[in-house]
Amino acid sequence: MSGTRIRYGYRKRPVTRLGAGAVLIGWIMVSTLAWAADRPPGLMVQNGRPAPDLRLTNMEGEVTDLRDLRGRWVMVHFWATWCGPCRKEMPSLQRMVQRMAPERLHLVLVNTAETDDEVFAFLGLVAPDLNSLMDRDGQVTEKWQPRGLPSSFLIDPKGRVRYLALGGRDWASEPYLAFLRHISQAPAAKVPTTRR
Amino acid sequence: MLDNPMMKRCIGMGALGLALLSAVAVAADPASESGVYTGHDLVVHAQARTPDQTTAFYLGRGFPAAMLKEFNQSCFVTVSMRHTRPDVVWLEPARWRLRDANGRIIERRDRHYWNRVWKAINAPHASRATFGWTQLPESRDLQPDEPVGGNITIVPPTGPFSLEFRFATGKNKTGPEIVGRIEGLVCQAQESDMVTGNAP
Protein backbone atom coordinates (compact mmCIF):
# COMPACT_ATOMS: atom_id res chain seq x y z
CA MET A 1 0.00 0.00 0.00
CA SER A 2 2.74 2.29 0.99
CA GLY A 3 4.62 1.29 -2.18
CA THR A 4 1.60 2.27 -4.20
CA ARG A 5 1.52 5.56 -2.45
CA ILE A 6 5.18 6.08 -3.29
CA ARG A 7 4.61 5.19 -6.91
CA TYR A 8 1.64 7.47 -6.98
CA GLY A 9 3.76 10.13 -5.45
CA TYR A 10 6.45 9.65 -8.06
CA ARG A 11 3.87 9.72 -10.83
CA LYS A 12 2.27 12.86 -9.52
CA ARG A 13 5.41 14.98 -9.57
CA PRO A 14 6.16 14.54 -13.30
CA VAL A 15 2.55 15.37 -14.09
CA THR A 16 2.85 18.57 -12.06
CA ARG A 17 6.13 19.45 -13.73
CA LEU A 18 4.65 18.70 -17.15
CA GLY A 19 1.71 20.97 -16.37
CA ALA A 20 3.96 23.77 -15.22
CA GLY A 21 6.10 23.35 -18.32
CA ALA A 22 3.05 23.47 -20.55
CA VAL A 23 1.84 26.61 -18.82
CA LEU A 24 5.27 28.17 -19.22
CA ILE A 25 5.47 27.26 -22.89
CA GLY A 26 1.95 28.53 -23.44
CA TRP A 27 2.80 31.79 -21.71
CA ILE A 28 5.91 32.20 -23.86
CA MET A 29 3.90 31.52 -27.02
CA VAL A 30 1.17 33.96 -26.05
CA SER A 31 3.77 36.58 -25.09
CA THR A 32 5.62 36.08 -28.34
CA LEU A 33 2.44 36.45 -30.38
CA ALA A 34 1.44 39.52 -28.41
CA TRP A 35 4.91 41.01 -28.89
CA ALA A 36 4.81 40.24 -32.59
CA ALA A 37 1.52 42.08 -32.86
CA ASP A 38 2.81 45.14 -31.01
CA ARG A 39 3.30 48.29 -33.02
CA PRO A 40 6.98 49.27 -32.83
CA PRO A 41 7.96 52.88 -32.08
CA GLY A 42 7.41 55.58 -34.68
CA LEU A 43 4.51 54.01 -36.56
CA MET A 44 1.41 56.21 -36.56
CA VAL A 45 -1.92 54.50 -37.09
CA GLN A 46 -3.83 56.10 -39.96
CA ASN A 47 -7.57 56.29 -40.52
CA GLY A 48 -7.83 53.87 -43.42
CA ARG A 49 -8.42 56.53 -46.08
CA PRO A 50 -7.97 55.37 -49.68
CA ALA A 51 -4.36 55.73 -50.80
CA PRO A 52 -3.82 58.54 -53.33
CA ASP A 53 -3.16 57.53 -56.93
CA LEU A 54 0.39 56.48 -57.67
CA ARG A 55 1.44 55.65 -61.21
CA LEU A 56 5.09 56.29 -62.05
CA THR A 57 7.95 54.82 -64.06
CA ASN A 58 11.30 53.63 -62.78
CA MET A 59 14.66 54.45 -64.39
CA GLU A 60 14.09 51.77 -67.04
CA GLY A 61 10.74 53.25 -67.98
CA GLU A 62 8.70 50.42 -66.43
CA VAL A 63 5.35 51.54 -65.05
CA THR A 64 4.09 50.72 -61.57
CA ASP A 65 0.49 51.49 -60.66
CA LEU A 66 -0.44 51.10 -57.01
CA ARG A 67 -3.89 49.82 -58.01
CA ASP A 68 -2.28 46.79 -59.66
CA LEU A 69 -0.81 45.78 -56.30
CA ARG A 70 -4.18 45.30 -54.55
CA GLY A 71 -4.41 42.06 -52.60
CA ARG A 72 -1.17 42.45 -50.67
CA TRP A 73 0.38 44.96 -48.32
CA VAL A 74 2.46 47.68 -49.93
CA MET A 75 5.04 49.95 -48.36
CA VAL A 76 5.25 53.25 -50.26
CA HIS A 77 8.53 54.91 -49.31
CA PHE A 78 9.35 58.51 -50.30
CA TRP A 79 13.02 59.47 -50.30
CA ALA A 80 15.79 61.63 -51.77
CA THR A 81 19.56 61.19 -52.00
CA TRP A 82 20.28 64.53 -50.30
CA CYS A 83 18.34 63.54 -47.17
CA GLY A 84 20.63 62.15 -44.43
CA PRO A 85 18.07 59.87 -42.72
CA CYS A 86 17.07 58.50 -46.17
CA ARG A 87 20.67 57.54 -46.87
CA LYS A 88 20.93 55.81 -43.53
CA GLU A 89 17.63 53.95 -43.88
CA MET A 90 17.93 52.67 -47.45
CA PRO A 91 20.21 49.66 -46.75
CA SER A 92 17.77 48.45 -44.10
CA LEU A 93 14.96 48.53 -46.67
CA GLN A 94 16.98 46.23 -48.90
CA ARG A 95 17.56 43.82 -46.01
CA MET A 96 13.86 43.99 -45.14
CA VAL A 97 12.89 43.01 -48.69
CA GLN A 98 15.29 40.06 -48.54
CA ARG A 99 13.61 38.78 -45.38
CA MET A 100 9.94 39.32 -46.31
CA ALA A 101 7.91 37.15 -48.66
CA PRO A 102 7.17 39.33 -51.72
CA GLU A 103 3.60 38.08 -51.93
CA ARG A 104 3.04 39.44 -48.42
CA LEU A 105 4.65 42.88 -48.66
CA HIS A 106 5.67 44.82 -51.76
CA LEU A 107 8.09 47.75 -51.42
CA VAL A 108 7.55 50.75 -53.69
CA LEU A 109 10.32 53.36 -53.55
CA VAL A 110 9.46 56.83 -54.82
CA ASN A 111 12.32 59.24 -55.35
CA THR A 112 11.27 62.84 -54.98
CA ALA A 113 12.28 65.23 -57.78
CA GLU A 114 15.78 63.97 -58.58
CA THR A 115 17.48 62.81 -61.76
CA ASP A 116 18.26 59.29 -62.97
CA ASP A 117 21.99 60.01 -62.52
CA GLU A 118 21.59 60.96 -58.88
CA VAL A 119 19.38 57.97 -58.06
CA PHE A 120 21.41 55.46 -60.07
CA ALA A 121 24.68 56.51 -58.46
CA PHE A 122 23.23 56.35 -54.95
CA LEU A 123 21.23 53.11 -55.13
CA GLY A 124 24.09 51.34 -56.88
CA LEU A 125 26.25 52.01 -53.86
CA VAL A 126 23.96 51.41 -50.90
CA ALA A 127 21.08 49.20 -52.11
CA PRO A 128 21.89 47.71 -55.52
CA ASP A 129 19.00 45.21 -55.37
CA LEU A 130 16.40 47.96 -55.14
CA ASN A 131 14.84 50.04 -57.88
CA SER A 132 12.95 53.27 -57.47
CA LEU A 133 10.07 54.97 -59.14
CA MET A 134 10.90 58.49 -60.26
CA ASP A 135 8.61 61.34 -59.22
CA ARG A 136 10.50 63.66 -61.53
CA ASP A 137 8.61 66.87 -60.81
CA GLY A 138 7.68 66.04 -57.21
CA GLN A 139 3.95 66.30 -57.85
CA VAL A 140 3.06 62.77 -56.73
CA THR A 141 4.96 63.26 -53.48
CA GLU A 142 3.06 66.51 -53.00
CA LYS A 143 -0.24 64.67 -53.44
CA TRP A 144 0.68 62.07 -50.79
CA GLN A 145 1.68 64.76 -48.28
CA PRO A 146 4.35 62.87 -46.32
CA ARG A 147 5.38 64.57 -43.08
CA GLY A 148 8.93 64.84 -44.41
CA LEU A 149 11.59 62.73 -46.09
CA PRO A 150 11.93 59.87 -45.59
CA SER A 151 8.33 58.77 -45.12
CA SER A 152 6.87 55.29 -45.38
CA PHE A 153 3.17 54.57 -45.79
CA LEU A 154 1.80 51.07 -45.21
CA ILE A 155 -1.12 50.35 -47.52
CA ASP A 156 -3.40 47.39 -46.83
CA PRO A 157 -4.53 44.88 -49.49
CA LYS A 158 -7.67 46.94 -50.14
CA GLY A 159 -5.65 50.04 -50.95
CA ARG A 160 -6.21 51.90 -47.68
CA VAL A 161 -3.56 53.85 -45.75
CA ARG A 162 -3.05 52.08 -42.41
CA TYR A 163 0.27 53.26 -40.98
CA LEU A 164 2.76 56.06 -41.45
CA ALA A 165 6.36 55.77 -40.28
CA LEU A 166 7.74 58.93 -38.70
CA GLY A 167 11.33 59.51 -39.85
CA GLY A 168 13.84 56.77 -40.56
CA ARG A 169 14.42 53.43 -38.80
CA ASP A 170 16.01 50.01 -39.21
CA TRP A 171 13.27 48.17 -41.06
CA ALA A 172 15.26 44.94 -40.93
CA SER A 173 15.36 44.87 -37.12
CA GLU A 174 13.28 42.18 -35.47
CA PRO A 175 10.49 44.35 -33.97
CA TYR A 176 9.70 45.86 -37.38
CA LEU A 177 10.02 42.58 -39.27
CA ALA A 178 7.74 40.87 -36.71
CA PHE A 179 5.20 43.66 -37.05
CA LEU A 180 5.26 43.58 -40.85
CA ARG A 181 4.91 39.79 -40.87
CA HIS A 182 2.05 40.02 -38.43
CA ILE A 183 0.01 42.59 -40.34
CA SER A 184 0.70 41.01 -43.70
CA GLN A 185 -0.74 37.68 -42.62
CA ALA A 186 -3.81 39.13 -40.90
CA PRO A 187 -6.99 39.90 -42.84
CA ALA A 188 -7.08 43.59 -43.72
CA ALA A 189 -10.38 44.06 -41.90
CA LYS A 190 -8.75 43.11 -38.58
CA VAL A 191 -6.08 45.79 -38.71
CA PRO A 192 -6.77 48.35 -35.96
CA THR A 193 -8.14 51.64 -37.23
CA THR A 194 -7.88 53.69 -34.05
CA ARG A 195 -6.00 56.88 -34.73
CA ARG A 196 -3.37 57.91 -32.24
CA MET B 1 31.13 77.15 -64.43
CA LEU B 2 27.48 76.44 -63.72
CA ASP B 3 27.26 74.33 -66.86
CA ASN B 4 30.12 72.04 -65.88
CA PRO B 5 28.51 68.78 -64.68
CA MET B 6 31.70 67.54 -63.02
CA MET B 7 31.97 70.78 -61.06
CA LYS B 8 28.33 70.47 -60.04
CA ARG B 9 28.89 66.96 -58.74
CA CYS B 10 32.05 67.92 -56.87
CA ILE B 11 30.38 70.90 -55.25
CA GLY B 12 27.29 68.87 -54.44
CA MET B 13 29.22 66.04 -52.87
CA GLY B 14 31.31 68.55 -50.95
CA ALA B 15 28.25 70.29 -49.60
CA LEU B 16 26.64 67.00 -48.72
CA GLY B 17 29.76 65.90 -46.92
CA LEU B 18 29.85 69.15 -44.99
CA ALA B 19 26.21 68.80 -44.05
CA LEU B 20 26.59 65.18 -42.94
CA LEU B 21 29.76 65.95 -41.00
CA SER B 22 28.19 68.90 -39.26
CA ALA B 23 25.13 66.82 -38.40
CA VAL B 24 27.34 64.20 -36.80
CA ALA B 25 29.30 66.85 -34.93
CA VAL B 26 26.18 68.55 -33.62
CA ALA B 27 24.69 65.28 -32.48
CA ALA B 28 27.80 64.35 -30.51
CA ASP B 29 27.25 66.48 -27.42
CA PRO B 30 24.36 68.92 -27.69
CA ALA B 31 24.71 70.32 -24.20
CA SER B 32 28.27 71.54 -24.72
CA GLU B 33 27.88 73.36 -28.02
CA SER B 34 26.51 76.67 -29.12
CA GLY B 35 23.50 76.68 -31.41
CA VAL B 36 21.71 74.16 -29.22
CA TYR B 37 18.78 74.39 -26.83
CA THR B 38 17.96 71.58 -24.43
CA GLY B 39 15.14 71.65 -21.93
CA HIS B 40 11.52 70.60 -21.40
CA ASP B 41 12.42 67.19 -22.86
CA LEU B 42 13.28 68.63 -26.24
CA VAL B 43 16.47 69.39 -28.13
CA VAL B 44 16.68 72.09 -30.80
CA HIS B 45 19.73 72.67 -33.02
CA ALA B 46 20.16 75.80 -35.15
CA GLN B 47 23.03 76.64 -37.46
CA ALA B 48 23.32 79.47 -39.98
CA ARG B 49 24.66 78.27 -43.32
CA THR B 50 27.30 80.18 -45.23
CA PRO B 51 26.28 81.43 -48.69
CA ASP B 52 28.75 78.96 -50.22
CA GLN B 53 27.22 76.03 -48.32
CA THR B 54 23.71 76.98 -49.42
CA THR B 55 24.71 77.60 -53.02
CA ALA B 56 26.81 74.44 -53.25
CA PHE B 57 23.98 72.26 -51.98
CA TYR B 58 21.41 73.53 -54.46
CA LEU B 59 23.89 73.90 -57.31
CA GLY B 60 24.82 70.27 -56.79
CA ARG B 61 21.14 69.37 -57.21
CA GLY B 62 21.00 71.10 -60.59
CA PHE B 63 19.15 74.24 -59.54
CA PRO B 64 19.12 76.99 -62.20
CA ALA B 65 21.20 80.13 -61.70
CA ALA B 66 18.10 82.29 -61.30
CA MET B 67 17.08 80.36 -58.19
CA LEU B 68 20.61 80.43 -56.80
CA LYS B 69 20.70 84.19 -57.17
CA GLU B 70 17.54 84.42 -55.09
CA PHE B 71 19.15 82.27 -52.38
CA ASN B 72 22.02 84.75 -52.20
CA GLN B 73 19.56 87.38 -50.98
CA SER B 74 18.63 85.28 -47.94
CA CYS B 75 20.34 83.59 -45.02
CA PHE B 76 19.52 79.92 -44.48
CA VAL B 77 19.35 78.64 -40.91
CA THR B 78 19.19 74.87 -40.54
CA VAL B 79 17.00 73.85 -37.60
CA SER B 80 16.40 70.35 -36.31
CA MET B 81 14.52 69.18 -33.26
CA ARG B 82 13.24 66.14 -31.44
CA HIS B 83 11.29 65.76 -28.23
CA THR B 84 10.67 62.96 -25.78
CA ARG B 85 7.59 64.44 -24.14
CA PRO B 86 4.51 62.22 -23.87
CA ASP B 87 2.34 64.78 -25.66
CA VAL B 88 2.35 66.57 -29.01
CA VAL B 89 4.69 69.54 -29.56
CA TRP B 90 3.58 72.02 -32.24
CA LEU B 91 6.22 73.19 -34.67
CA GLU B 92 5.08 76.59 -35.99
CA PRO B 93 7.99 78.77 -37.21
CA ALA B 94 5.58 81.66 -37.82
CA ARG B 95 5.41 82.04 -34.02
CA TRP B 96 9.18 82.23 -33.65
CA ARG B 97 11.03 85.51 -33.33
CA LEU B 98 14.48 86.30 -34.67
CA ARG B 99 16.16 89.43 -33.28
CA ASP B 100 19.44 91.18 -34.00
CA ALA B 101 21.82 92.48 -31.33
CA ASN B 102 19.73 95.65 -30.99
CA GLY B 103 16.52 93.71 -30.47
CA ARG B 104 15.13 94.48 -33.91
CA ILE B 105 12.93 91.79 -35.45
CA ILE B 106 14.47 89.98 -38.42
CA GLU B 107 12.02 89.09 -41.16
CA ARG B 108 11.51 85.41 -41.95
CA ARG B 109 10.73 84.47 -45.53
CA ASP B 110 8.04 81.81 -45.49
CA ARG B 111 6.77 79.46 -48.19
CA HIS B 112 4.35 82.05 -49.55
CA TYR B 113 7.27 84.37 -50.19
CA TRP B 114 9.21 81.69 -52.05
CA ASN B 115 6.20 80.50 -54.02
CA ARG B 116 5.74 84.05 -55.31
CA VAL B 117 9.41 84.24 -56.28
CA TRP B 118 9.36 80.86 -58.04
CA LYS B 119 6.26 81.82 -59.96
CA ALA B 120 7.82 85.12 -61.01
CA ILE B 121 10.96 83.48 -62.39
CA ASN B 122 9.16 80.37 -63.65
CA ALA B 123 11.33 78.00 -61.61
CA PRO B 124 11.27 74.30 -62.60
CA HIS B 125 8.78 72.18 -60.64
CA ALA B 126 11.42 69.63 -59.62
CA SER B 127 13.62 72.34 -58.10
CA ARG B 128 10.64 73.94 -56.37
CA ALA B 129 9.74 70.54 -54.89
CA THR B 130 13.27 69.82 -53.66
CA PHE B 131 13.55 73.31 -52.21
CA GLY B 132 10.23 72.82 -50.42
CA TRP B 133 11.30 69.53 -48.84
CA THR B 134 14.50 71.13 -47.54
CA GLN B 135 12.49 73.77 -45.65
CA LEU B 136 11.13 73.36 -42.14
CA PRO B 137 7.37 72.67 -42.23
CA GLU B 138 5.12 75.66 -41.53
CA SER B 139 3.05 73.58 -39.11
CA ARG B 140 3.57 70.12 -37.67
CA ASP B 141 2.13 68.26 -34.68
CA LEU B 142 5.34 66.54 -33.65
CA GLN B 143 4.71 63.15 -32.06
CA PRO B 144 6.96 61.86 -29.26
CA ASP B 145 10.43 61.11 -30.66
CA GLU B 146 9.46 62.23 -34.18
CA PRO B 147 12.49 63.88 -35.78
CA VAL B 148 12.12 66.99 -37.93
CA GLY B 149 14.67 69.20 -39.63
CA GLY B 150 14.99 71.76 -42.37
CA ASN B 151 15.86 75.34 -43.17
CA ILE B 152 14.21 78.61 -42.31
CA THR B 153 15.17 81.57 -44.47
CA ILE B 154 15.58 85.12 -43.21
CA VAL B 155 16.61 88.53 -44.45
CA PRO B 156 20.37 88.47 -43.76
CA PRO B 157 21.04 90.41 -40.55
CA THR B 158 24.29 92.23 -39.84
CA GLY B 159 25.98 90.82 -36.76
CA PRO B 160 24.86 88.10 -34.39
CA PHE B 161 21.20 87.32 -33.88
CA SER B 162 19.01 85.15 -31.67
CA LEU B 163 16.24 82.70 -32.36
CA GLU B 164 13.40 82.59 -29.85
CA PHE B 165 11.01 79.70 -30.39
CA ARG B 166 7.62 79.01 -28.91
CA PHE B 167 5.98 75.61 -28.96
CA ALA B 168 2.36 74.95 -28.08
CA THR B 169 1.87 71.49 -26.59
CA GLY B 170 -0.94 68.96 -26.40
CA LYS B 171 -3.23 67.64 -29.09
CA ASN B 172 -5.42 70.76 -28.95
CA LYS B 173 -2.57 73.14 -28.04
CA THR B 174 -3.93 73.44 -24.52
CA GLY B 175 -0.79 72.20 -22.74
CA PRO B 176 1.95 74.39 -21.27
CA GLU B 177 3.80 76.55 -23.79
CA ILE B 178 7.51 75.97 -24.18
CA VAL B 179 9.69 79.01 -24.82
CA GLY B 180 13.40 78.81 -25.53
CA ARG B 181 16.17 80.79 -27.14
CA ILE B 182 19.36 80.16 -29.08
CA GLU B 183 21.84 83.05 -29.10
CA GLY B 184 24.90 83.92 -31.08
CA LEU B 185 23.85 82.86 -34.57
CA VAL B 186 25.70 84.61 -37.39
CA CYS B 187 25.04 84.87 -41.13
CA GLN B 188 28.01 85.63 -43.36
CA ALA B 189 27.50 88.87 -45.21
CA GLN B 190 29.11 88.24 -48.58
CA GLU B 191 27.37 86.50 -51.44
CA SER B 192 28.61 83.23 -52.83
CA ASP B 193 31.03 83.54 -55.74
CA MET B 194 29.66 80.30 -57.13
CA VAL B 195 26.54 82.05 -58.43
CA THR B 196 28.31 84.89 -60.17
CA GLY B 197 31.00 82.62 -61.58
CA ASN B 198 33.81 84.47 -59.82
CA ALA B 199 35.04 81.48 -57.91
CA PRO B 200 38.71 80.70 -58.43
Question: Language-model features: where?
Answer:
Chain B
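Intrinsically disordered, low-complexity peptide-like regions
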Residues: 1-2, 108
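Bacterial N-terminal signal peptides that target proteins for export
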Residues: 2-15
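Bacterial N-terminal signal peptides
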Residues: 13-23
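Conserved functional micro-motifs across diverse proteins
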Residues: 27-200
